[in-house]
């Protein structure tokens, strides 16, 4: 069924409901049942284009995160470390992230949130490979198994996501925005965000879960606003101009603001923790947040068969399990500093250990719990 705008002002609530009912188009029975026939491809060409944009965008994002991490490592090893925002390399990573996010945002205009959001698992694989290549992380057997499970989950997600085409107009967004489901949802998000922000700012708690939960809460607003903005632009091109409605610019401002603060918290996480841990955990949190946002705000599972929903959730489970296998037992990154250990010289007694002082060009002793009187002069102890 094609999307039809209400003819007159009349009863606005009733008109909005009528428009919503016309804005949903589900595939025929059997469509979206996992079959990869030629008919399936023809029916889902627009969705597949969105999937391609999302995959490419996530690969670029994984590259950008590793570049930012490499920038932090370089700055930390300098004699006089500079702020990260003065690093050209760091800004290059931010620019790449913007490109990747642009591809992701565009993807939401061609496919449902519940289809695009879980595809962030592609960045897990990309991040692991890039970290092994450039940051010298170890590639383990569990990484390969996790990657395989992530791809299996992606296959199920693409084939069993709701086969829905939804026309997003300004009236539709306005109706969703004042719905009781979304109002309850956004109030809960604001409360959780304020509590976490209090612990982060006032208590100095910078645990990765706190940082990435803040990112995920902002991300839910991002995907809602991105879907609204891109949907209204598409509706303007295909049907009736929507850019004259104030709601378009309200959603645009929400999109920009939420993106800016996401970058702030995500950058803090990548500075403190290994990207091979940050990226996958961020994927899990973001995916859950985005799926909930799509279900509550855009009602993307409305009328979907139970089997489709079950297999879709199973695909999410496989994706998350793959992410867990990739991230488990990852040690926090430590800066590699050169030091000399006299005890490692064959036939020599251990006299002392010395290493470069991280903040000067001089040499000093490594701390030793058995002797708290070591001097920075490197003098030998009597044996």
From Swiss-Prot:
UniProt-annotated glycosylation sites, renumbered to this chain: 23, 33, 274
Main localisation: membrane
InterPro entries in alphabetical order: Mg_trans_NIPA
Disordered: region residues: 355-383
Localization (cell): Membrane
SUPFAM superfamilies: Multidrug resistance efflux transporter EmrE (SSF103481)
Lipid bilayer topology: Multi-pass membrane protein
Gene Ontology BP term (one): magnesium ion transport
GO molecular function (one): magnesium ion transmembrane transporter activity
GO CC term (a single one): membrane
This protein's record includes keyword Membrane: yes
Keywords in alphabetical order: Glycoprotein, Membrane, Transmembrane, Transmembrane helix
UniProt similarity note: Belongs to the NIPA family.
Name used for this protein in its record: NIPA-like protein 2
Transmembrane segments: 46-66, 88-108, 110-130, 144-164, 177-197, 209-229, 243-263, 278-298, 306-326
Short name of one Pfam family: Mg_trans_NIPA
């Amino acid at each position: 069924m094609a999307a039809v705008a209400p003819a007159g002002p009349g009863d606005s609530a009733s008109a909005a409901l009528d428009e919503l009912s016309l804005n949903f188009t589900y595939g025929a029975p059997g469509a979206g049942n996992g079959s990869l026939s030629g008919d399936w491809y023809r029916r889902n060409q627009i969705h597949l284009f969105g999937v391609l944009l999302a995959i490419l965008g996530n690969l670029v994002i994984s590259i950008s995160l590793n570049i930012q991490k490499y920038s932090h490592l370089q700055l930390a090893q300098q004699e006089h470390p500079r702020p990260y925002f003065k690093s050209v390399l760091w800004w290059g990573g931010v620019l790449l992230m913007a490109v990747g996010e642009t591809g992701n945002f565009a993807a939401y205009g061609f496919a449902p949130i519940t289809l695009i959001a879980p595809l962030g698992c592609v960045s897990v694989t990309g991040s692991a490979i890039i970290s092994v290549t450039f940051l010298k992380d170890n590639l383990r057997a569990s990484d390969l198994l996790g990657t395989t499970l992530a791809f299996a989950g992606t296959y199920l997600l693409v084939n069993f996501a709701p086969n829905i085409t939804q026309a997003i107009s300004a009236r539709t967004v306005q109706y969703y925005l004042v719905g009781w489901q979304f109002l309850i949802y956004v109030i809960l998000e604001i409360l959780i965000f304020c509590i976490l922000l209090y612990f982060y700012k006032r208590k100095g708690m910078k645990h990765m879960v706190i940082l990435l939960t803040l990112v995920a809460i902002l991300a839910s607003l991002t995907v809602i606003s991105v879907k609204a903005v891109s949907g209204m632009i598409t509706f303007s091109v295909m049907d009736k101009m929507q850019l004259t409605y104030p709601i378009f610019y309200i959603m645009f401002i929400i999109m920009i603001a939420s993106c800016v603060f996401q970058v702030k918290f995500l950058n803090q996480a990548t500075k403190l923790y290994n990207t091979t841990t940050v990226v996958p955990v961020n994927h899990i949190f973001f995916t859950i947040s985005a799926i909930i946002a799509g279900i509550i705000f855009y009602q993307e599972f409305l009328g979907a068969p139970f089997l489709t929903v079950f297999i879709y959730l199973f695909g999410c489970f496989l994706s998350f399990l793959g992410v867990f296998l990739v991230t488990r037992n990852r040690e926090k990154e430590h800066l590699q500093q050169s030091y000399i250990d006299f005890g490692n010289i064959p036939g020599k007694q251990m006299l002392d250990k010395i290493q470069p002082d991280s903040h000067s060009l001089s040499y000093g002793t490594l701390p030793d719990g058995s002797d708290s009187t070591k001097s920075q002069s490197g003098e030998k102890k009597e044996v």
